[in-house]
Amino acid sequence: MEEYILEIFNSREELCAKYKIDNIKILRLDDEGAKTKLALIKTKNFNLKFIFMYYDMGLKPQLINFFKRNFIILGIQSKIIRIDLENNVIDTLVDFSIIPFFEFLENDSYLIAIFEMGISVINEDGELKWKLELPEILIDWEIVDENIKLFYFDGKIGIHSLKTGELLS
């Protein structure tokens, strides 16, 4: 499978000027406005796959290549999106509505999506294992064995099982 790259543009004009694209189909996650950006997904050889328009919350989207399977995972806005590259099918795995996506973490078994006040775990088949809205804003996190340790803004610490999402302490 080819490696896919994510590139961010401030406007349609900026995108079209760089890549000389005229008629582009844009998948809209939000209406076009002052704070929208464009996320272009392509191969290293510029085989254009998808362009998303999204509301810029100030956090950069992140793309994960699932080399074992023929799909990629995009964390953008408050969503986790799975893109099936064989069939060009896009599925939203997680949508926390207004809770911003921060980053992905990976271990041998799972892809963990960290949000401002949420967490979700995706298995190696690209399926959502579990998701959890959290009671407080996250300020830090780390994987410890088969668990994830979450540090909250209010000073509390929680440890959850990556396998089940169960709160262990």
PLM ranges: what are they?
Residues L40-M57, V89-P100, E127-L134, L168-S169:
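Aromatic (tryptophan-biased) beta-strands that constitute blades/sheets of beta-rich domains
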Residues K44-I90:
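A glycine-rich, hydrophobic loop/mini-helix early in the fold
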Residues I81, S120-V121, G158:
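WD40 beta-propeller blade core
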Residues I5, I143-S169:
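Acidic, small-residue rich beta-repeat scaffolds with periodic aromatic anchors
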Residues K68, I76-S78, E86, N107, ...:
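Short loop/turn segments that connect beta-strands within the blades of beta-propeller domains
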Residues E2-D30, I51-R69, D95-D108, L134-N147:
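Repeated scaffold domains used in trafficking and secretory/extracellular systems
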Residues L85-N88, N123-E127, L162-T164:
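Short loop/turn segments that connect beta-strands within beta-propeller blades
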Residues I72-I73, Y110-I112, K149:
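Conserved beta-propeller blade signature
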